């Protein structure tokens, strides 16, 4: 007796395939390819997941006891056109892939550029070595070729209501919420990378230890970059940068908004950071001091690298302020309320759901 298999992609597209119980998973993949197209759903690139397990090609469908009321997740591991695949540590510096996942900027328009001497002191050969990265890590900044690429990179992340929806979708594969949250955090909210982590193992500790990202990075710095020659060193002692780093470590859901802010307001600095990804990530992963409030950081974003009189502040309308006050009345600290409110694109209901689902502890 034929059964109906409901399938759902990570983009939340749902479709159904009729199968005979004795037919194998491989046959199901072939039917998916035939219906959806070889380019989008090649058999070789498909991974079918049910109840947290990858379905084996040679196993009959009936062996997995798939409930027709539930669904099988279809994940395609084929690389998208225009996006690079992380290169191995031995890759040549001249073949630089475009990162598949953007790394969050923590800076904005007011941030000063690094001292020009940091570039003038290098020979042309050194410059070509230090301004191209031989790897694309999960937390890399986007290639600085064009604003279009920055937008493409930002589109791979989820935030706000999309974050909560994606969290639920991945949990429906059979994973616990804690592990899904850890995988999303490790992948900087890239759902495809997060599922890969759940299947192959989350880098480092399953707990959100920020040092694991730093420890997982290969390879060593190029020989021409001696220790202490970090061109982004000028950021380290700036209080605004320190506060922004702390806020990002507290709430990774703010990463997409900050990425867009940097790309729009200070593309030159984004270019500089993209040339020195490893140093920037190491600085961002350094242990924070006292916790910072997003309300403080939002006003300081434009002042990094400049004098205090040039600080920019984010203004909120009276309606937005009332919404923030109502969220605070639910019992959450103001800093967390503001984080959630802006992360959910100023949608009060989504922010409330986000706060309640995260089970934040009062600071």
Curated annotation (Swiss-Prot):
Q: Which UniProt keywords apply?
A: DNA damage, DNA repair, Isopeptide bond, Nucleus, Phosphoprotein, Proteasome, Repeat, Ubl conjugation
Q: What is known of its domains?
A: The ubiquitin-like (UBL) and the UBA (ubiquitin-associated) domains interact intramolecularly in a highly dynamic manner, as each UBA domain competes for an overlapping UBL domain surface. Binding of ubiquitin or proteasome subunit Psmd4 disrupt the UBL-UBA domain interactions and drive Rad23a in to an open conformation.
Whichever gene encodes this chain, its name is Rad23a
Return the InterPro entries for the record.
Rad23 (IPR004806), RAD23A/B_UBA1 (IPR041811), STI1_HS-bd (IPR006636), UBA (IPR015940), UBA-like_sf (IPR009060), Ubiquitin-like_dom (IPR000626), Ubiquitin-like_domsf (IPR029071), XPC-bd (IPR015360)
Tell me the ranges covered by the Ubiquitin-like domain, including all copies. Answer: 1-79
Q: Do you know which PANTHER family this protein is assigned to?
A: UV EXCISION REPAIR PROTEIN RAD23 (PTHR10621), UV EXCISION REPAIR PROTEIN RAD23 HOMOLOG A (PTHR10621:SF29)
Q: Which GO terms describe its cellular component?
A: cytosol; Golgi apparatus; nucleoplasm; proteasome complex
What range does the record give for the signal peptide?
A: none
The entry's protein name is UV excision repair protein RAD23 homolog A
Q: What does this protein do?
A: Multiubiquitin chain receptor involved in modulation of proteasomal degradation. Binds to 'Lys-48'-linked polyubiquitin chains in a length-dependent manner and with a lower affinity to 'Lys-63'-linked polyubiquitin chains. Proposed to be capable to bind simultaneously to the 26S proteasome and to polyubiquitinated substrates and to deliver ubiquitinated proteins to the proteasome.
PROSITE patterns from the UniProt entry: UBA (PS50030), UBIQUITIN_2 (PS50053)
- Please describe the quaternary structure of this protein: Interacts with XPC; the interaction is suggesting the existence of a functional equivalent variant XPC complex. Interacts with PSMD4 and PSMC5. Interacts with ATXN3. Interacts with UBQLN2.
Q: What organism is this sequence from?
A: Mus musculus (Mouse)
Q: Name one GO biological process term.
A: nucleotide-excision repair
Q: Where is this cross-link: Glycyl lysine isopeptide (Lys-Gly) (interchain with G-Cter in ubiquitin)?
A: 122
The record, for Pfam families, names:
UBA, ubiquitin, XPC-binding
Localization in the cell: Nucleus
